[in-house]
Amino acid sequence: MGEPQQVSALPPPPMQYIKEYTDENIQEGLAPKPPPPIKDSYMMFGNQFQCDDLIIRPLESQGIERLHPMQFDHKKELRKLNMSILINFLDLLDILIRSPGSIKREEKLEDLKLLFVHVHHLINEYRPHQARETLRVMMEVQKRQRLETAERFQKHLERVIEMIQNCLASLPDDLPHSEAGMRVKTEPMDTDDSNNCIGQNEQQRENSGHRRDQIIEKDAALCVLIDEMNERP
């Protein structure tokens, strides 16, 4: 017997839409555009909703009787509703045992339905708070990750600086050129108020030739240093 085929609990992805969103189609602008936003009303779970409706609609607007006052403690009311559901469920079991065909059975079912609606409504009123809390936790995680990244970068930077300092300390003292010759000289820019272009060009050529000589001297010193390092056992 072959292995049993695993069936996914979710429906398969819509391949007729996925194949249209290739990289080539997106780059060429051939991918289908998203549907326009809904402006009036829409259907969801068999019910019609308006776009300007509140996310959490009041119970009265849905034709449902309110069992708790306008000002209340959510935790306290949820505990009371939970206890009421348990008591009504036990009453329903007692009715089913004593008189299954009694009309009280339907009344008790309606009471349980109303209690569950209130429980879900109070839980949904916590959704904005849950969204804010989720966003806060996400931002804290991002902050911690960035701080850890910055700390790792600082450690690597300190390690690189230490390696460079060790390399500089291990350089031999008998270099062909002095340390001052190895440094990059920074001099203030010469300003010439004259408008003689020929003099300026000659000065630029002299400066460029001087810089080229400095670069050649530094390259020679570096080559000598590398040769000495290779000759060491």
Curated annotation (Swiss-Prot):
* InterPro entries recorded: Immune_Mod/Transcr_Coactivator, Med7/Med21-like, Mediatior_Med7, Mediatior_Med7_sf
GO cellular component terms given for this protein: mediator complex
**Disordered: annotated segments:** 185-213
Q: Can you cite a GO biological process for this protein?
A: regulation of transcription by RNA polymerase II
What main location does UniProt list?
A: nucleus
| Covalent cross-link (Glycyl lysine isopeptide (Lys-Gly) (interchain with G-Cter in SUMO2)), residues | 185
Task: State one molecular function term (GO).
Answer: transcription coregulator activity
The places in or outside the cell where this protein is found are: Nucleus
Modification type Phosphoserine: residues: 194
What UniProt keywords are attached to this protein's entry? Activator, Isopeptide bond, Nucleus, Phosphoprotein, Transcription, Transcription regulation, Ubl conjugation
Q: Where is this cross-link: Glycyl lysine isopeptide (Lys-Gly) (interchain with G-Cter in SUMO1)?
A: 185
A Pfam family it matches? Med7
Give the compositionally biased regions (Basic and acidic residues).
203-213
Q: Which PANTHER family match?
A: MEDIATOR OF RNA POLYMERASE II TRANSCRIPTION SUBUNIT 7, T-CELL IMMUNOGLOBULIN AND MUCIN DOMAIN CONTAINING TIM
**Assembly, per entry:** Component of the Mediator complex, which is composed of MED1, MED4, MED6, MED7, MED8, MED9, MED10, MED11, MED12, MED13, MED13L, MED14, MED15, MED16, MED17, MED18, MED19, MED20, MED21, MED22, MED23, MED24, MED25, MED26, MED27, MED29, MED30, MED31, CCNC, CDK8 and CDC2L6/CDK11. The MED12, MED13, CCNC and CDK8 subunits form a distinct module termed the CDK8 module. Mediator containing the CDK8 module is less active than Mediator lacking this module in supporting transcriptional activation.
- Into which family does the record put it? Belongs to the Mediator complex subunit 7 family.
Described by its record, this protein's role is as follows: Component of the Mediator complex, a coactivator involved in the regulated transcription of nearly all RNA polymerase II-dependent genes. Mediator functions as a bridge to convey information from gene-specific regulatory proteins to the basal RNA polymerase II transcription machinery. Mediator is recruited to promoters by direct interactions with regulatory proteins and serves as a scaffold for the assembly of a functional preinitiation complex with RNA polymerase II and the general transcription factors.
Under what name is this protein listed?
Answer: Mediator of RNA polymerase II transcription subunit 7
